[in-house]
Each structure stands twice: as structure tokens, then as C-alpha cells.
């Protein structure tokens, strides 16, 4: 080291510190996901970020990393009205250019989304910006099978998260913004707690020109897709053709191609008229990762600069399907195929070809509704010879007629229109959501335009409207009484289980139990029991004072000698336990807390009465864990073994937390 200049030595030291911080923190910002409370149910896999494999060097090529993740970001962003540039920048910031343990195999979590994914979760150290300072915490994060699921899940969060009125991340949608800067501004303080989050994302987007991956909000492919050296394929009407600017090193058919900066697996395969699966198989590509200078085998491919007239039936199929809506294309033979274009989605393709989403997904084994430009999909099975346009026209007329005439007989069907939901359809036909869901085997309340639903038992559209109006008039008052003395309340738009319970002075558990609520799901117009018997007609008058009484902010003693505390908004199990100098285990045990879930207004025991408390043995010695300490460190400092500390305190996966009291002597 003596031969290294002082400035260079300082630079090297700073780089080492930077890498250590990146490895020791899974992410900077954290996504707000409602189901994260479910994570503790799953047996956690303990991972310390400091034990990350040395893979930072593999990701140091920024262009290669961007090219890899852009393969996923671009089609997913287009299908969800999001900015691909913002999604890519988020992945860069949250994963530290793919160097964090969380973003690497086998976790593939690029965005730091907490909770569990299909039962898979991993606990990692993370930095949270709380109370104007950075705090190290160990949190549960989702584990994905690949980057594709990570991008899809992030898009789902941005499109569907709602805590009341409207969607929480609607400010990130292209249709609601003027540029990507509006989207990054919306993410700051919502998606991430870092106050400088927007600036970091904007800097990455401008530095690396990520806007080239964005497309207009309309879903038009114009200018969005880049291949090779920036050639634009978005403005071509023929999905099989390529830009003459796509460049490339391929000199003869069936030879090799040298990857350039900005290339992606999709871009290269598209420019040579082959599928992504072929390119991946021929070159043994893992996780869609390629890098500049890499030579790829292009078997049977054509020169990147040539036309696509020789690509055979595949390109022809793409052209025919792409023109389905504008001309009377050739008849579809058995197993007709369609080549996915930029901006396409599973719903759009199914709708264009007069088939259901389930059929398209089943015929092509589509996972998580993920399709990508250049992918060939089976859009017709059987011997039907009708053209795609004829099928579309017929479907459109059917939908129009259904909408106009409604259902007139028992067991009739209804075609879903754009913007409709399970609630609105059931309300339109005077049936319950449960009936509509049961009759049509609807999953996760998901329906889509063009889907045919059984609305048997419902009246015609006109009668349904009258019935709905009558229902609304009857339920105009917020709370009413039933003949049995039970007070009921009609849910309004934007309300939640907690909100209704709090407004009516009851607990969430009571509201859930009295109304058999599942997954905390309620909907506008639903009537809920908010008082069990002996209520008067003016239920709201007796309930409102209770709701308006402010929650106690200081612990109160109960008749049993227990000290209780009322949970405030934003508090967690750890926060309440830490505030009252008890362990999380004590708080959970005393209050029978499930899944670490507490809610504002809940009264929890924070100190047991003298008669019920269990004093520690006189010869036992306890120690309170401080921030940054580990099982080994605590055991070593008290002259005991790790096994003793673990056994005496029933420690799982070597996980301890600040404020926890541990027995260190028996």
C-alpha cells in the first residue's frame, strides 16, 4: 500500500465502504404493500446481507444490467400504463445495480417489496428513514422465481394498491402524468421513505437515457422499442419487420452476433426474426443476462439489416394477426398464431381474436399474464375458418346487444364492459357479489372486458336499476336498526374495515365476526351489522360520541391490574413493545396477537398486573439487546455459548432485535 498515492488509497477505501454498505442493506426505499403482515406466518430463511456472494463485479457493467432488466420492464410497463424508465431506475436504486443479496438468486427481488410471494419470503437487514434518521431493521421480503415475477409484482403494486379513496400510486401512471418526473415525485414518500428518492431516480434516467424504453400512454408502440444501436422498431406497422438502423455484426446467415451496449435478449431475437426462447436455448443464457462484446449464436437467423420476407410463416402470421382489426385478413386455420406487438397485453390479444383470456393463457401456458413483443401465441384452435376481424366484429355486436338489452331471463349472461367491477355488475343486476363470484368461479374479484358472466336470478337491466335505486334510498342513512335490535351500517366508497369499526365504536374483530368478513374485504353498498342486539333506532346518535372520543395516548390500568395502551396510527408491534420496555414476545403473548397485526384504536396490555406477572428467578440475569448486536456477540460478552443463549431464550434463526430482553445467566 505504500506505493499507492494517498488520493488513490482514499478512493479505494471509499469504494470498499460503499460496497459494504450496499451489501449490508437490502434496499434504501421500501414498498408499501398491504399483505406484508402475512410474512411472519412463513418459516423465514435467515440471510445476512454481509454474507452476500461476491457478485458485485458481475454487475458493474451498468449497460449490461440495464439491457437485462429492460427486457422485462418494457413490455410489463407498456401493459400497465407505467414508465419503463422509472421501473428500470427503481430496480437500479433498490438493488444497487443488482449487487444486493435480495436482488440475486434465489430471491430475485429487485424492488424491495415486503411480505411473501406464493408462500416464499426472506428476512434481511434494511435501512429505513424514520424520525429524520436512518435506522437498521430486519424485515421480511418477497422471494420470486425470476426477475419477471419481480417486475410483474411491482407493476401490480403500482396499479392496484389502495388504502381508501382512489389508488395510492395513481400518480405514477402515464395517463395521469405529463412526464416520468411526475411519477418519480409521486413515489417519494409513498413507495420509499428516502426524501431524495425522486432525485436519484431522475438522475439515473437522464444519465443512462432510459426514456428510450418508454412508450406513449395510449399503448402505441411508436418510438418505444429499441434494438441494436438504438434503431426504432416501434413505428413499423409490420410486427415482423426490423429497422435498418438495428446494426449488428452478423455477416452471414446462421452465424454469430456480437452484443452491443443497449442490446437485450428480446431486441436481438426480434431483429433476427427468432424467438427469445430460441436465442436463450442456443446460447445457454441465464436470467436473460447478456453483456456487450458477448458473441451469440444465431442459428438459421437472417442478417439484422435484411427484410423479413424470408422468415416464413412466423412473420406472415404476425402480419396477418396484426392487421386483424383493420382488414378482412385471411382465414384462420387450425392453431392460427399471432405475433405479440409492443403494447399488447393478454386481454387485448384475447379480445382482438374473439377468445377469452383463459383460453389464451391455457393454449400458450402463459404465466402471470406476461407476454412480450415477438412472442408467438396460439389464438385459434379447432377447424374454424372465420377470420379474426369477423370474430371481433361478431364479439363486438354481441357485447353491444347484451349491454343494450340486458338480461331478461333466468340463467342469462352479461358481457362485461370496460371499467366494470364485480360489485358494479352484481349491483346492476340486483344480486350479491358472492352470488356473482360463485356462479362464475371468479378469482380475486378479477373480471375483464368481454368476459361473459352468468347473472341468473337477476332481473333485467331496467328492473335492476330500479331495484338498485330503491336499495340506495332505503340505505340513505348511514346506520339503521333491524327488527332484532341489531344496528346496521351501509358501506360507502373508500371505507375500510378499520374505518367502519372505528366510526361505530366497535373493534375490527367484532365487525369481522358479526359479518363473516373475509380478508378484510368490504364493498360500497354492503350492509354490515355494527351493533349486536338491544340497539335503538337512532344507532348513529349513540355511536358517534364514542367514535369522536380521542384515543388514549398514555397507558391506563385495568381492573385486573394490567396496564393497557391504545395503539395509534402508524405503530407496530415492535414500536409499542419498545416504547413500553417489553419484548415483542411478551406483547404478542399477553394480547394474543396474530401475524404481528395491530390496528389504531386497539387496546393492548403493556404491563401485567402483580398477581399475574411471573417474576424472574432470583439467580437469572437478563440483558437488553442493543442495536447492531448479534447472538454471537451477546453470548461472547457474557461468557456463555451461542447454544446456551439460543436454548435459554428460544431464539429462532439467530434472530434478535434491539430492546429484546435475553437471559444470559441461569
UniProtKB/Swiss-Prot annotation:
Catalytic reaction equation(s): Hydrolysis of (1->4)-beta-linkages between N-acetylmuramic acid and N-acetyl-D-glucosamine residues in a peptidoglycan and between N-acetyl-D-glucosamine residues in chitodextrins
Region Disordered, annotated ranges: 232-251, 300-335, 381-412, 459-485, 541-563
Signal peptide limits: 1-49
Keyword Repeat carried by entry: yes
One CC-aspect GO term: extracellular region
Record keywords: Antimicrobial, Bacteriolytic enzyme, Cell cycle, Cell division, Cell wall biogenesis/degradation, Glycosidase, Hydrolase, Repeat, Secreted, Septation, Signal
The EC number(s) this enzyme carries: 3.2.1.17
Matches recorded under SMART domains: LysM, LYZ2
Compositional bias annotation for Low complexity: 234-251, 382-412, 459-484, 541-561
The keyword Flavoprotein belongs to this UniProt entry's keyword annotation: no
Pfam families xref list: Glucosaminidase, LysM
BP GO annotations: cell wall organization; defense response to bacterium; division septum assembly; killing of cells of another organism
Domain remark in the UniProt entry: LysM domains are thought to be involved in peptidoglycan binding.
Family: Belongs to the glycosyl hydrolase 73 family.
Protein name stated in the entry: Muramidase-2
Organism lineage: Bacteria, Bacillati, Bacillota, Bacilli, Lactobacillales
Amino acid at each position: 500500500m505504500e506505493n499507492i498515492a494517498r488520493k488513490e488509497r482514499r478512493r479505494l477505501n471509499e469504494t470498499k465502504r460503499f460496497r459494504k454498505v450496499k451489501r449490508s442493506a437490502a434496499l434504501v426505499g421500501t414498498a408499501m404493500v398491504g399483505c406484508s403482515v402475512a410474512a411472519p406466518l412463513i418459516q423465514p430463511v435467515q440471510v445476512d446481507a454481509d454474507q452476500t456472494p461476491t457478485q458485485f463485479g458481475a454487475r458493474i457493467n451498468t449497460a449490461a444490467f440495464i439491457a437485462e432488466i429492460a427486457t422485462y420492464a418494457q413490455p410489463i410497463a407498456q401493459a400497465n400504463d407505467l414508465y419503463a424508465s422509472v421501473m428500470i431506475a427503481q430496480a437500479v436504486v433498490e438493488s444497487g445495480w443488482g449487487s444486493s443479496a435480495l436482488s440475486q438468486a434465489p430471491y430475485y427481488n429487485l424492488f424491495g417489496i415486503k411480505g411473501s410471494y406464493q408462500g416464499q419470503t426472506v428476512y434481511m437487514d434494511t435501512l429505513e428513514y424514520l424520525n429524520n434518521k436512518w435506522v437498521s431493521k430486519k424485515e421480511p421480503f418477497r422471494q420470486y422465481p425470476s426477475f419477471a415475477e419481480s417486475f410483474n409484482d411491482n407493476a401490480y403494486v403500482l396499479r392496484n394498491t389502495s388504502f381508501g379513496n382512489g389508488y395510492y400510486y395513481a400518480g405514477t401512471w402515464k395517463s395521469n402524468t405529463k412526464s416520468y418526473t411526475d411519477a418519480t415525485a409521486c413515489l417519494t414518500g409513498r413507495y420509499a421513505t428516502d426524501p431524495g428518492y425522486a432525485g436519484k431516480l431522475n438522475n439515473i434516467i437522464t444519465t443512462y437515457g432510459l426514456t428510450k424504453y418508454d412508450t406513449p400512454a395510449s399503448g402505441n408502440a411508436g418510438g418505444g422499442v429499441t434494438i441494436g444501436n438504438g434503431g426504432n422498431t416501434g413505428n413499423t406497422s409490420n410486427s415482423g419487420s426490423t429497422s435498418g438502423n438495428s446494426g449488428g455484426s452478423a455477416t452471414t446467415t446462421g452465424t454469430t452476433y456480437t452484443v452491443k451496449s443497449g442490446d437485450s435478449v428480446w431486441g436481438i431475437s426480434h431483429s433476427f426474426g427468432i424467438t427469445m426462447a430460441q436465442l436463450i436455448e442456443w446460447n445457454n443464457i441465464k436470467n436473460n443476462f447478456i453483456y456487450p462484446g458477448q458473441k451469440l449464436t444465431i442459428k438459421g437467423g437472417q442478417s439484422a439489416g435484411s427484410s423479413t420476407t424470408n422468415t416464413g410463416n412466423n412473420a406472415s402470421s404476425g402480419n396477418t394477426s396484426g392487421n386483424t382489426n383493420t382488414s378482412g385478413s385471411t382465414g384462420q386455420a387450425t392453431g392460427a398464431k399471432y405475433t405479440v406487438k409492443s403494447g399488447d397485453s393478454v386481454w387485448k390479444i384475447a379480445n382482438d381474436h374473439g377468445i377469452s383470456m383463459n383460453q389464451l393463457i391455457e393454449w400458450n401456458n402463459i404465466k402471470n399474464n406476461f407476454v412480450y413483443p415477438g412472442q408467438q401465441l396460439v389464438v385459434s384452435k379447432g377447424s374454424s375458418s372465420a377470420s379474426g376481424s369477423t370474430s371481433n366484429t361478431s364479439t363486438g355486436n354481441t357485447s353491444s346487444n347484451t349491454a343494450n338489452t340486458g338480461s331478461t331471463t333466468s340463467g342469462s349472461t352479461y358481457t362485461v364492459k370496460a371499467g366494470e367491477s364485480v360489485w358494479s355488475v352484481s349491483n346492476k343486476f340486483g344480486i350479491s357479489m358472492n352470488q356473482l363470484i360463485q356462479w362464475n368461479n371468479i378469482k380475486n374479484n378479477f373480471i375483464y372486458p368481454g368476459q361473459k358472466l352468468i347473472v341468473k336470478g337477476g332481473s333485467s337491466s331496467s328492473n335492476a336499476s330500479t331495484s338498485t335505486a330503491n336499495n340506495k334510498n332505503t340505505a340513505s342513512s348511514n346506520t339503521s336498526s333491524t327488527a332484532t335490535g341489531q344496528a346496521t351500517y351501509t358501506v360507502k366508497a373508500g371505507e375500510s374495515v378499520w374505518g367502519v369499526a372505528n366510526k361505530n365504536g366497535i373493534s375490527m374483530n367484532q365487525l369481522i365476526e358479526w359479518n363473516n368478513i373475509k380478508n378484510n374485504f368490504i364493498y360500497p353498498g354492503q350492509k354490515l351489522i355494527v351493533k349486536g342486539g338491544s340497539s335503538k333506532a337512532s344507532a348513529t346518535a349513540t355511536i358517534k360520541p364514542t367514535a369522536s372520543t380521542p384515543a388514549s395516548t398514555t397507558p391506563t390500568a385495568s381492573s385486573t391490574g394490567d396496564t393497557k395502551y391504545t395503539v395509534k396510527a402508524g405503530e407496530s408491534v415492535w414500536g409499542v413493545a419498545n416504547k413500553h420496555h417489553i419484548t415483542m414476545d411478551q406483547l404478542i403473548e399477553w394480547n394474543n396477537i396474530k401475524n404481528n397485526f395491530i390496528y389504531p384504536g386497539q387496546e393492548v396490555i403493556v404491563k401485567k398486573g402483580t398477581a399475574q406477572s411471573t417474576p424472574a428467578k432470583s439467580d437469572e440475569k437478563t440483558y437488553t439487546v442493543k442495536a447492531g448486536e448479534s447472538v454471537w456477540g451477546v453470548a461472547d460478552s457474557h461468557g456463555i455459548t451461542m447454544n446456551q443463549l439460543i436454548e435459554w431464550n428460544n431464539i429462532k434463526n439467530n434472530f434478535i432485535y434491539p430492546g429484546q430482553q435475553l437471559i444470559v445467566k441461569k
